[in-house]
Swiss-Prot record:
This is UPF0145 protein Npun_F4817. The lineage of its organism: Bacteria, Bacillati, Cyanobacteriota, Cyanophyceae, Nostocales. Belongs to the UPF0145 family. Pfam families: YbjQ_1. It comes from the Bacteria.
């Protein structure tokens, strides 16, 4: 399976467009991680725990996207976009949201 951000794959011919595929990954926040990230933000520096979480989430979203495309009979997903964001849950924290979207295609 080819997964790419481009809309064209050199040397390949798209036989059919099978539709838009989307995958979402949601993580709950962690009080200790949030606290330590806040301290790093105050003194400067990167928050490695959140960076790892977003990297892991992007990988999982792309894996899920590939599975959904395969169920449609695709052998490639083109035009991939990955979006990240947060969902506020009032006093109880936030959810981290990672979304991957692309177009499932059948190529030859």
């Amino acid at each position: 399976m080819i997964i790419t951000t481009t809309d064209v794959i050199q040397g390949a011919v798209i036989e059919s467009y099978l539709g838009i595929v989307t995958a979402e990954v949601v993580y709950g926040s962690n009080f200790l991680r949030d606290f330590l990230a806040g301290i790093r933000d105050i003194i400067g520096g990167r928050t490695a725990s959140y960076e790892r979480l977003f990297e892991q989430g992007q990988r999982k979203a792309l894996e899920e996207l590939e599975q959904r495309a395969q169920r449609l009979g695709a052998n490639a997903v083109i035009g991939i976009e990955i979006d990240t964001g947060t969902i506020n849950l009032d006093q109880s924290g936030v959810l981290l949201l990672i979304t991957a979207t692309g177009t499932a295609v059948k190529m030859r």
